[in-house]
């Protein structure tokens, strides 16, 4: 345990009080956890991967661009999808790549390999090491469990403890590495203010990136930066396509926005999804009206594609996600 509770660890009726990080780990990844369910994330919410095949096409283009900058000795280009869900993104990228492109695809996911998945996709719980290419993590870091801190009336930051029914109370003071992280990345805003302690995410990201010998690592998530942290945190739940109260009983996703600036290493760049996809040729621009006369079928296809691109880049929606580009120079 990284805390000392101000009360007993369990109520008289046996209800256990634990920090949010521990509760989330059980609720998402335990034997009956939310992410162990057969339907997977797609059964409860829609990510950019599910919104349009254009997203996979953009990642395929990013992979080919990354491959051009790899050392000549690299004969096989790795594509590592961290938090792969049921393999939807990798399946789409493999379909979008040019014929004969020398890719080796890795899905990193704690759930079991789905039946019928493309046999070219290797499945495991940990990122590979010693590979060169593109590591891509779409909405992974927000599901790396973190502890929650709340400032009490005396100005002391304390761990928030939670029961399986979602009820909360304050525990012991935040100390050690967690306190240092808050001091550096999310200073207190006064009594009642809350913060998610992102240190485990920083460490998870650094460990994933360390597996690349050369190439590019990209994390995509809803995020915030220093100077723009939400005063009461962002911890929430999702189930059946709706935002719900976060209850760590395995019945809903539990997530919180990511302090991506804290994850960023030397040479990293943070850009909006809108700008990132535009760099990769996804803009949402409507096709010229003249095409409707010269080639009506092509115009209809282009119009549909523009609509999908507009959703991926929309302000106030998916376009506001943040992309962290972390280059990994060859050693």
Listing of model-derived features with the role each one plays in the protein:
Residues 36, 144-146, 228:
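Short helix/loop capping segments that flank catalytic or ligand/cofactor-binding pockets
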Residues 132-133, 215:
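Conserved acidic residues
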Residues 85-88, 142, 224-225:
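Gly/Ser/Thr-rich loops at beta-strand to alpha-helix junctions
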Residues 80, 108, 135-138, 220:
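Active-site flanking residues adjacent to catalytic metal/cofactor-binding acidic residues
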Residues 1-126, 131, 149, 275, ...:
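Rossmann-like AdoMet
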Residues 134-186, 232-240:
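A mobile, often basic/glycine-rich helix-loop segment
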Residues 179-331:
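Long, Lys/Arg- and hydrophobic-enriched amphipathic alpha-helices
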Residues 124-126, 141-156, 197-207:
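A short, conserved alpha-helix within the catalytic core of class I
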């Amino acid at each position: 345990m990284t805390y000392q509770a101000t009360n007993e660890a369990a109520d008289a009726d046996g209800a256990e009080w634990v920090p949010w990080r521990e509760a989330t780990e059980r609720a998402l990844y335990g034997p009956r956890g939310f992410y162990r369910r057969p339907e997977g994330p797609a059964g409860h919410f829609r990510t950019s991967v599910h919104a349009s095949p254009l997203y996979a096409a953009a990642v395929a283009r990013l992979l080919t661009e990354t491959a051009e900058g790899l050392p000549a000795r690299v004969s096989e280009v790795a594509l590592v999808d961290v938090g792969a869900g049921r393999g939807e993104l990798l399946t789409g990228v493999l379909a979008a790549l040019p014929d004969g492109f020398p890719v080796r695809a890795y899905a990193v996911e704690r759930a079991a390999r789905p039946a019928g998945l493309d046999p070219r996709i290797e499945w495991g719980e940990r990122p590979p090491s010693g590979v060169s290419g593109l590591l891509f993590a779409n909405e992974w870091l927000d599901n790396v469990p973190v502890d929650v801190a709340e400032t009490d009336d005396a100005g002391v930051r304390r761990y928030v403890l939670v029961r399986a029914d979602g009820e909360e109370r304050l525990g012991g003071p935040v100390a050690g590495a967690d306190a240092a992280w808050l001091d550096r990345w999310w200073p207190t805003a006064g009594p009642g203010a809350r913060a998610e302690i992102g240190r485990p995410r920083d460490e998870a990201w650094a460990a994933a990136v360390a597996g690349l010998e050369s190439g590019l690592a990209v994390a995509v998530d809803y995020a915030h930066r220093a100077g723009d942290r939400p005063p009461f945190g962002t911890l929430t739940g999702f189930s059946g396509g709706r935002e719900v109260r976060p209850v760590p009983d395995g019945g809903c996703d539990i997530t919180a926005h990511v302090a991506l600036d804290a994850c960023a290493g030397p040479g990293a760049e943070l850009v909006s999804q809108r700008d990132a996809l535009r760099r990769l040729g996804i803009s949402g621009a409507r096709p010229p009206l003249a095409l409707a006369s010269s080639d009506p079928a092509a115009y209809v296809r282009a119009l549909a594609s523009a609509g999908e691109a507009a959703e991926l880049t929309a302000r106030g929606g998916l376009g506001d996600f943040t992309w962290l580009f972390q280059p990994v120079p060859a050693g």
